[in-house]
Amino acid sequence: MDINHQNQCIPYNCLSNPDAILLDAERLETGNTVADISLGLINFLYSNFVPGGGFIVGLLELIWGFVGPSQWEIFLAQIEQLISQRIEEFARNQAISRLEGLSNNYEIYTETFRAWEKDPSNPALREEMRTQFNVMNSALIAAIPLLRVRNYEVALLSVYVQAANLHLSVLRDVSVYGQRWGFDPATVNSRYSDLTRLIHVYTDHCVDTYNDGLKNLEGSRLSDWVVYNRFRRRLTISVLDIIAFFPNYDIEAYPIQTASQLTREVYLDLPFVNETLSPPASYPTFSAAESAIIRSPHLVDFLNSFTIYTDSLASYAYWGGHLVNSFRTGTTTNLIRSPLYGREGNTERPVTISASPSVPIFRTLSYFTGLNNNNPVAGIEGVEFQNTISRSIYRKSGPIDSFSELPPQDVSVSPAIGYSHRLCHATFLERISGPRIAGTVFSWTHRSASPINEVSPSRITQIPWVKAHTLASGASVIKGPGFTGGDILTRNSMGDLGALRVTFTGRLPQSYYIRFRYASVANRSGTFRYSQPPSYGISFPKTMDAGEALTSRSFAHTTLFTPITFSRAQEEFDLYIQSGVYIDRIEFIPVDATFESEINLERAQKAVNALFTSTNQLGLKTDVTDYHIDQVSNLVECLSDEFCLDEKRELSEKVKHAKRLSDERNLLQDPNFRGINRQPDRGWRGSTDITIQGGDDVFKENYVTLTGTFDECYPTYLYQKIDESKLKAYTRYQLRGYIEDSQDLEIYLIRYNAKHEIVNVPGTGSLWPLSVQSPIGKCGEPNRCAPHLEWNPDLDCSCRDEEKCAHHSHHFSLDIDVGCTDLNEDLGVWVIFKIKTQDGHARLGNLEFLEEKPLVGEALARVKRAEKKWRDKREKLELETNIVYKEAKESVDALFVNSQYDQLQADTNIAMIHAADKRVHSIREAYLPELSVIPGVNAGIFEELEGRIFTAYSLYDARNVIKNGDFNNGLSCWNVKGHVDVEEQNNHRSVLVVPEWEAEVSQEVRVCPGRGYILRVTAYKEGYGEGCVTIHEVDNNTDELKFSNCEKEQVYPGNTVACNDYNKNHGANACSSRNRGYDESYESNSSIPADYAPVYEEEAYTDGQRGNPCEFNRGHTPLPAGYVTAELEYFPETDTVWVEIGETEGTFIVDSVELLLMEE
């Protein structure tokens, strides 16, 4: 192999040190490159991060006491070369001098810490430690802005991240040791706030600057992509890998040693391609190279084997194509076979290169053939693969060493032990026509991403969910935001994320808190499941807006409420989430009794303090619900008496105070459901099928259960009125509460009109179980310390303005705006819960109705406009009501002989009573259309007339000697021969249907001999033949009414009117003076607006007809066309008569049969 050939290849793989040539299996010394230093730091951070002096000294020895001006120059030069921009001399010298100053200060800081650590109670050393911290902190605050000089942010980025890392480590020191150094708690808390804030500031600056630099390198040519990929690889190692560790500096989130992993992949270089040999169009473009070489986001995989195929061009044999077999984390037996990369050449026998979880390939020595005048192919002639116990060679070894870009992380040991990366895959860029390109590109993962997800018994273990072995349908892996150390997972619809297998390495059983790092565009819920029941509900509070870019501030932690004890060495987990949630990783935090008690106490203290608007507990925060106060109370009650009895008592008093404040601001009467229908004008009113139940594992206090109904006109309901005296003018109020589960639950707030939502909430054992096991205590009480859905104050069903209600949410809220108030009118606000379906049900409690905020601006103008419109329509309703009431009253009065309403007119029949009843029911707003048991503005006059209608029915029933003459009770009191039916037609009207000529219906009736009676029948005949109603005594005295569907004249016994004339005269005119005929009586009056309904028409409220179909169907409908009422006079001679109904052919339909005693 000649030196010239080597030199053509090396510069494209070793740009930071073009003269370095690595030939042997052991790495030759090449100086302290950026990759050397960065990977050493990454190893130190990810493997040896333990609070204390060891970390401080280690950071000094590794970076700040070791790297001098020449090394800082290398940091700057590496990026300068990639972006073709040299930092101006002033900015360069300023940056290096500042870095030197930080090194000097940190050396003094470290020596002072060593001295103090040996004698921590020495006052002088404590004071010196405070001084040196202040000096170090001030120096960093002054230096870091100078490392992001405008226009040179990209070139300075790799030194900026080093300074940022140092600053965060120093702030962590003071958060841990500050009070022992003599700082007051307020100062320590302030520095801790700086720490958490700067984690985001430094992270976002690094990611934004990296992305800017990468975008600026985008081009169109293949050579542009080579530089682009180098920048991506090198700054991933020197910048992004380091900032991925930054969250671990948070002392409260990570108080003990933490095991972290990097799952990102980096790609080495393509073989050299001289783009001047052929026209530019002959070569792959920038985008083609990116698409072919860089794999799309995927679950982490590990190399099992390569199958390499050899191809040739002229006399040159080269790597022509390959297959990759790989496996996912924890599943070595389920191999994943890649598609064929390149071509399946047969110049030589295929070569298989193997790897395994315990024997990875950590180094390659490649022999590149660059595309130039001497070589017709840009490709690989041979590669040596080194694993931790041996080596394998494809054709021959070469000089291009992967260690030049991915050096060992520990040079103090053999490379087989101190390596930093594993080979995980190889992609391929191929060009057949024109210049031949067979570019194999190796991709590598950091060794911290182990093939087995091991959970430590003594450290916090972070496992990225991208290390799942199976991706669920509907879930996707997306490109990480740059600071997570790899890709992340999400879903575009509700469902599982993917199966993650872990192995517990310590003695079992072992308990862990389970925590997730996530981002969410809205308040979401999820379920954490594994092979042992139960499942655990988890909340994902909103951290970002939809459409917003993922930043460091977008990510937060959410923790299961209680620890989980694992007794098996291997478990498989899955996470059920909604769309808009991004999952980075799961974290296992080991606990023991003392640690758990400390965690629980800290959690309870934070939860209690978070209830109030200030430290003096004078007021509750608006978003703190009554349900949440109960849950915080449970949290306090679950504290250990053994470890924190005094703190528990203090917190308990604060929670009780919070509960009293919650009761004071709640405008509902009896919010804890001491009873329903206890007082006529106060508290809750409800249907009889509602039950009140005592507290359980979900509710601490009473809650109500609503069941389904078989008739939507008779729903299950619960309601209460908020009196006008409790309301403030021009104020928004909020109804809220907690729903354990519900189906078809309708919630209303009614003032000017209805705010309405239908809420379906899966409950226990469904999508998000709260406490699947529902364990009980020793006395049968619910165990509220069991795992359940952690409360999230924003996880609600908030229906405000034009927003839609987020269903499937246990917390709900509904707003309503109040305009001016009038105590005389006492409009108030109606609160209604209703179920009108058979499958409907609900369990709800902790209901609140409270003042939210005064109305201003657009909201104020909107409610004023709506209120005016409502009042205008109320005036129209009054005009309508006056007209309808007058007509209804006339119809009712016409039924009776006098104003005492104690006697019916002689010719009043059942149809006339029905007609009058229907006209009474045409009075609008007698009851609320949303719930017809609640009186409306016209309830008084409606009930007045409806009472007289009931009197008319009673008097009618009393004088009609035929029992069940309207068939409302079916065939009761009637004797039946053959087949007949009673059918309900036109809603409330029951009719007798005689379908066969042999059928007969009869009734024996007791009468007074010698007195006169009127037999009146309303009926309809279908088809041919006649329908007959006969009245007779035992021997003789028979009379009959016949009904026929005919056109010719037909004489009825005792009546000379033909059927057409009878229908015309008696069926209409006979009653027109009383009720204007049955059909006409229900027509709309043209003087009344037919589409009237009081409406609050603004966007936040429903507009249109507030109609209740059940209300409209009340009263009896008119007889359809074709029905005839006929009557005859009958004078019985004995005390018993028979009334018989039959027909000769077709179908005979009878609406009513009356036998009325004539007045003397």
UniProtKB/Swiss-Prot annotation:
One of its GO terms (molecular function) is signaling receptor binding. SUPFAM superfamilies: delta-Endotoxin (insectocide), middle domain (SSF51096), delta-Endotoxin (insectocide), N-terminal domain (SSF56849), Galactose-binding domain-like (SSF49785). The keyword Magnesium does not apply. CDD domains: delta_endotoxin_C. Transmembrane segments: none annotated. It comes from the Bacteria. InterPro entries: Cry1Ac-like_dom-VII (IPR048645), Cry_V (IPR041587), Galactose-bd-like_sf (IPR008979), Pest_crys (IPR038979), Pest_crys_Cry1Aa_dom-IV (IPR054544), Pest_crys_dom-III (IPR005638), Pest_crys_dom_I (IPR005639), Pest_crys_N_sf (IPR036716). GO terms for biological process: sporulation resulting in formation of a cellular spore; symbiont-mediated killing of host cell. Keywords: Sporulation, Toxin, Virulence. Gene3D superfamilies: Galactose-binding domain-like (2.60.120.260), Pesticidal crystal protein, central domain (2.100.10.10), Pesticidal crystal protein, N-terminal domain (1.20.190.10). Promotes colloidosmotic lysis by binding to the midgut epithelial cells of insects. Toxic segment of the protein is located in the N-terminus. Belongs to the delta endotoxin family. This is Pesticidal crystal protein Cry1Db. It comes from Bacillus thuringiensis. The gene is cry1Db.
